[in-house]
């Protein structure tokens, strides 16, 4: 069963690509037609490829590994933050810092610094320093929080990236590819699909299109995590029965 309906994709404007003169020829297999100088994405292919991507993300999420949501453009940032938070996943919605993946140990130091300042605010340290020092530390924490807040709880590299607008997030793409981290992405008609492992041909500019796709990814993660918990609970419930059966078998011997 598909995760999407063709009608909802049409309503969200998923099919609207960029001006034909701005296209990437490598997107030709995913384009249905040109209308009034604008490329129209083949939604039948989007349906199939989106399902493939979501099934793969489901498998990753069930392992307990994290999927990083990335989208820093104006139309995407609030959606990325809200849906990633709902799914309990790390996210980047303000600015991608160079080395966020390839130099993760240094990024972790910045996160520890941010958390250290936060502790100072609650453990009484702020009461022992000057007003100027408090202000400087508060500003430092605010800046770090704005950029790193979405990955504050991330302790290791993500198992995959889900990206909105691969042209804008080219640094994230480059870092993930260098580390062999799978990339799932909405890919518009002006982008190179060969940069991505799981292509979802879609309008990456319209808010409703972004919302539809990002929500679907978050829903997939939430459901996969819930299934994992359910399976673990069932396994724990079955364990005593297995132990009892083994004990009975040993006694019979």
UniProtKB/Swiss-Prot annotation:
GO function term, MF aspect, one: structural constituent of ribosome
Hydrolase as UniProt keyword: no
Record-linked CDD domains: RPS2 (cd01425)
Keyword Ligase among record annotations: no
Keywords from the named record: Ribonucleoprotein, Ribosomal protein
Matches recorded under Gene3D superfamilies: Glucose-6-phosphate isomerase like protein, domain 1, Helix hairpin bin
Gene Ontology biological-process annotations: translation
One cellular component term from this protein's GO annotations in UniProt: cytosolic small ribosomal subunit
Top-level taxon of origin: Bacteria
Pfam families found in the cross-reference section: Ribosomal_S2
Coiled coil: none
Matches recorded under SUPFAM superfamilies: Ribosomal protein S2
UniProt family annotation: Belongs to the universal ribosomal protein uS2 family.
NCBIfam families the record matches: rpsB_bact (TIGR01011)
Protein name per the record: Small ribosomal subunit protein uS2
Species for this entry: Chlorobium luteolum (strain DSM 273 / BCRC 81028 / 2530)
Annotated gene: rpsB
